[in-house]
Regions:
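Extended, histidine- and acidic-residue-enriched regions that form the cofactor-binding/catalytic faces
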Residues: 134-200
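Secondary-structure boundary elements
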Residues: 58-69, 129-134, 162-166
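Internal, conserved structured core segments that host functional sites
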Residues: 34, 47-99
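Surface-exposed cleft-lining segments at the edges of enzyme active sites
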Residues: 43-50, 111
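A generic local secondary-structure boundary/capping motif
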Residues: 26-28, 58-59, 124-126
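Catalytic cores of processing enzymes, dominated by hydrolases/peptidases
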Residues: 78-158, 198
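N-terminal short beta-loop-beta anion/metal-coordinating cradle
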Residues: 1-43
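Short beta-strand segments
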Residues: 39-40, 71-73, 139-141
């Protein structure tokens, strides 16, 4: 259920139309039964606004007595991921408190030992401790510029493990992943054949 929107004159002015209904591009949905809220942004947010948006999310979470925030951050792979290797899609994570890290361990999610996290997830991690809110950031491997539905499916499954009751249409995501992988393979094959023809 849509319960709120985040608006700013600094955002790109965009209206997202779904089933003939216009929506603000940055929205908050909530499920009262599951005590779960989801922030959705369908615009790219300027880096200069990360701090403002991150703190807006944290303040909203505090005002609504949320005790856990789950965010995600991309880990870009320069080379294509081997879809046949499940380890390629393993997700690592970081928690801002001992309680958050124990929650990850209980869900058998690997902890990031060393590294950096940027953007809004970094603001959530750095600013949340003073508010007493647990934050978990899931790190997902992607290939830059290519929609990766397998990674999305893995992310959705991981969130479902952390928040029982939250679900997503995983089979549909995997079906889309398979379709896109076949298209990419076909394009690469055609490109290789064209290169061979060029050399006679």
């Amino acid at each position: 259920q849509l319960i709120a929107t985040i608006e700013s004159s600094y955002f790109s002015q965009l209206s997202v139309v779904r089933n003939s209904i216009p929506y603000f591009p940055v929205r908050i949905y909530a499920n009262e039964e599951l005590k779960t809220a989801i922030f959705i942004s369908e615009i790219s947010i300027e880096p200069s606004l990360y701090y403002l948006v991150g703190n807006t999310m944290l303040n909203w979470a505090k005002d609504n007595e949320c005790d856990l925030i789950i965010s995600s951050s991309n880990s870009v792979n320069p080379q294509p991921i081997d879809a046949s290797n499940p380890n390629e899609y393993s997700i690592a994570a970081i928690g801002n408190t001992v309680r958050a890290r124990n929650r990850l361990k209980d869900s058998k999610i690997a902890l990031l030992n060393n590294g950096t996290i940027g953007g809004i997830p970094a603001v959530l991690l750095n600013q949340s401790s003073v508010l007493g809110i647990d934050v978990i950031v899931l790190l997902v491997k992607i290939i830059e510029g290519i929609p990766d539905f397998r990674a999305a499916a893995e992310l959705s499954t991981t969130i479902s493990n952390l928040v029982p009751g939250v679900s997503c249409n995983i089979p549909l995501l995997l079906q889309e992943a398979e379709r896109i992988e076949k298209e990419i393979t076909k394009i690469k094959t055609q490109g290789t054949e064209s290169e061979m023809d060029a050399y006679g």
